[in-house]
C-alpha cells in the first residue's frame, strides 16, 4: 500500500488546533487602499473553520 499523502495546498492554508483547524482570512493581501481601517483590522489574525467544513479538511489532511 502506498503512503497516504496530505493535500499540499491545504497543508499550507490550514493549521490544526485542539478544537479543529484555523485559517488566515481572505481579502487582506492587496488593494488595501480602498478598504477601511476597521475592515482591515477585523480581517487580521486567524479564524476557526466552520463545523460544516471540518470533515472536508480532515479528509485532505489525514496526517495532521
From Swiss-Prot:
Gene Ontology cellular-component annotations: cytosolic large ribosomal subunit
InterPro entries noted in UniProt: Ribosomal_bL35, Ribosomal_bL35-like, Ribosomal_bL35_CS, Ribosomal_bL35_sf
Gene3D superfamilies referenced in this protein's UniProt entry, alphabetically: 4.10.410.60
Coiled coil regions in record: none
BP-aspect Gene Ontology terms: translation
Tagged with keyword Ribosomal protein: yes
Ranges annotated as biased composition (Basic residues): 12-44
Pfam families xrefs: Ribosomal_L35p (PF01632)
Family, as annotated: Belongs to the bacterial ribosomal protein bL35 family.
Protein name: Large ribosomal subunit protein bL35
Gene responsible for this protein: rpmI
